[in-house]
């Protein structure tokens, strides 16, 4: 399924255009269908998958926040921190302190 594809490739630089093409739909039609079936936008779903992955990296004190961001598929640490805070209500560093505290 498309969700399985996104899950498997979430660390890559995948775009809405690319996924819509793989699914065989226009970007507009894919966006509507994806929202209907997942109750999420494509980018929200993708970011949630990336954050799930980042949580495992953040649990390892040997992996920096920047490294966790890059290994999770985020283009840069600032985007990662912004998305992480929106999803989890705290920064990655704050999360790590709570997790390892």
Predicted region positions:
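Pre-recognition alpha-helix immediately N-terminal to the DNA-recognition helix
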Residues: 1-5, 52-56
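Basic/polar phosphate-binding segments, predominantly the helix-turn-helix DNA-binding elements
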Residues: 5-7, 13-49, 63, 69-94, ...
């Amino acid at each position: 399924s498309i969700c399985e594809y996104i899950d498997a490739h979430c660390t890559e630089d995948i775009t809405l255009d690319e996924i819509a093409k793989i699914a065989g739909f226009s970007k507009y039609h894919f966006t509507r269908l994806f929202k209907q079936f997942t109750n999420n936008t494509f980018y929200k779903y993708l970011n949630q998958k990336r954050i799930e992955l980042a949580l495992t990296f953040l649990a390892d004190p040997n992996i920096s926040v920047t490294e966790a961001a890059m290994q999770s598929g985020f283009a840069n640490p600032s985007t990662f921190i912004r998305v992480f805070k929106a999803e989890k209500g705290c920064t990655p560093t704050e999360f790590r302190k709570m997790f390892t505290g």
